[in-house]
Amino acid sequence: MKNVLSIQSHVIYGHAGNSAAVFPMQRLGVNVWPLNTVQLSNHMQYGHWAGSAIDAAKMEQLVDGIAAIGALKRCDAVLSGFLGSPAQARAAVEIVRTVKATNPNAWYFCDPAMGQTGGIRPEPGVEEFIVAELPELADGMAPNHSELQKLAGQRIETVAEAVAACRLIIRRGPQVILVKHLHDRNSPADRFNMLVVTETEAWIGQRPLYAFPRHPVGVGDLTSAIFVARRLRGDSVRAAFEHTLAAVHAVVKATYDARRYELELVAAQDEIARPSEWFGAWVTGAD
């Protein structure tokens, strides 16, 4: 069974960061080692919360502890999400380097959280660090539309522009870019666009966009987690993308139908593993 070290925020109540990522990856047959960068009572969109960030040095100490018992060599991938400070971001880089040195076959998937995540805003300097340092280290990245523009340093309004931006980033190191949410001026307003791009291929997919009174938090974290899990299970990029599109839709639909604010991960767990409604991806902007 594959193992992934997941470095993200965590909420006790609800689903954001590792609280949105761990169970879906486990449900898909992947062992998850959660390292929580932030421990909160709940996500901050509620307006009240309690909790704090973990010290960056302790992040590295925890991973050193795994290495000390000889288990780090079994880590097949690292997934990073919210990093609250430049010190945490640097610690994540050192952790990835340690994992890759221990297991040369391990890979790193970066969800470059640069804006507000569950109401949490990273400290000044995190965005600049991510843009400058992480593409060279990452084997894959999962930006949203805004983060893609920051990574590429350009405005994006169409699918073609998004594909070109992804290819700019790919030249710096990643083999695959998953755009978790793409705004396209040519797409229908009731559709949610996702895009995945490699050096030579690109696929776009759409799912229904639901009119929530207030949108649930953690959908992006769920998206990255499912994609990583399916890739660890051996799916091709396209197959992992299509499974991610379908499974995330199932969770979002279950949440909308139940009139809930927090993602209905447990209720929709069978759909995460075996989605009943699929949305085929089609080739776009391929060389």
Curated annotation (Swiss-Prot):
One Pfam family hit: Phos_pyr_kin
Entry keywords, A to Z: ATP-binding, Kinase, Magnesium, Nucleotide-binding, Transferase
GO MF terms, alphabetically ordered: ATP binding; magnesium ion binding; pyridoxal kinase activity
Involved pathway(s): Cofactor metabolism; pyridoxal 5'-phosphate salvage; pyridoxal 5'-phosphate from pyridoxal: step 1/1
Group of enzyme by EC: transferase
Binding residue positions for ATP: 111, 142, 147, 180
The keyword Magnesium is assigned to this record: yes
Record-listed substrate binding positions: 9, 44-45, 221
A single cellular component GO annotation: cytosol
Cofactors demanded by this protein: Mg(2+)
GO biological process: one example: pyridoxal 5'-phosphate salvage
Catalytic activity: pyridoxal + ATP = pyridoxal 5'-phosphate + ADP + H(+)
EC code: 2.7.1.35
PANTHER family per the UniProt record, alphabetical: PYRIDOXAL KINASE
Family: Belongs to the pyridoxine kinase family. PdxY subfamily.
UniProt subunit comment: Homodimer.
HAMAP family on file: PdxY
Task performed by this protein: Pyridoxal kinase involved in the salvage pathway of pyridoxal 5'-phosphate (PLP). Catalyzes the phosphorylation of pyridoxal to PLP.
Name of the featured protein: Pyridoxal kinase PdxY
Origin species: Burkholderia pseudomallei (strain 1710b)
